[in-house]
Amino acid sequence: MAHSAALPFVLSRSDDKIAGREITSTHETIHGLLRLDGDRVHVQWRVARSTDRVGREIRTDREVEPVREAVIPLSTIAGATVRWRWRWPPGPYLVLTAADLRAFEEVAGAAGLNLNHPAELALPLRRADRALGNEFAGELELALAERALAAAEGNPMLATPDTPHANNTNDA
């Protein structure tokens, strides 16, 4: 059975610098979407950056980067859960745990998302999206369990509807 689910997320990060007689404040808002599509998790995100400069002149520069996407195979994910974070900012977080340290390499980095640990992708959720986060984690866990069951039975993964033999119902 092919699983599908989608979950939006929003990240914020900022950086302030004082150099000589100039103050620079940069604020980035990252709007993203996690999408479970069969045996892959797609992570899409767009960075909107606002840079305020105060010095000889006062100005604000705004920039929106193009959408980036990373595809993570389910075979590199060990699990998913929604946790409550009590530290600032408190709220629900979706945590994807990697089965391979290379799982989140495409997502992390200077142009990507910041990871506190290379084996965990923790994404803050809006409080209104907590139930949606639990549903996404459940769908992902179900897809992982079905993969493990198929591997234990020695069966190939269930055919997806777009493969030619998936809908073959010949009784002859």
Which residues does each PLM region occupy?
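Anionic N-terminal interaction surfaces
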Residues: 1-58, 63-66
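Acidic, Ser/Thr- and proline-rich intrinsically disordered linker/docking segments
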Residues: 2-6, 29-31, 60-172
